[in-house]
Amino acid sequence: MPCVLPQRITPKLCKIIKKYHPVYVNTHFNHPWECTPEAEKACAMLADAGCPVGNQAVLMKGVNDNPDVMLDLHRKLLKMRVRPYYIYQADLTKGTNHFRTPVSVGLEIMDKLRGHTSGLAIPYYVIDAPGGGGKIPILPQYVLGRNGNDIILRNYKYNIYTYPDVENSTQQENVVEQPYMRKRTNGRKAASPKVVPRELVPAEK
């Protein structure tokens, strides 16, 4: 409503909202051009009424499938006191296939948001799984593997770092189990652990 019908956010409505806290509002700003003065005023009124405001954008081909556009959008939202919450991968809805982008595009956007703006401006990138699977977060891979007791990490610049993990007698050298590679199936692993590429392991000094 603050995006497409900001005039509906009135002092009377905000007075009602104040009576029934907690009330949360999620908006649907998809492009920085939608962050108009009218929309900003509406969001400010909600925030002043004690209503936390979030945003759920949808990744759409030709609209916002660009890291610079998404960065601009989320910076403007923060200035409007709106917390970026989700970037949705476009749903499998009839008649909207021309808006869908590869998941790799969304991952690239998330990778380029990190390190270039406040963490408050970085939403979750999610797929609303078909068949009632719910919202599943899709993340760039920052944990590359393990070398003995060291976790091999990369940052947003793709620089490689090691972090000494807490010792665990069950860990295996050169192996790290990625969270997305496991599921609970009567205690059995669903997939093999990921082995650290040798070229990514920093040389010992």
Predicted regions: what they are:
Residues M1-T117:
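Conserved AdoMet/S-adenosylmethionine-binding subsite of the radical SAM
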Residues L78-K205:
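Auxiliary Fe-S-binding modules of radical SAM enzymes
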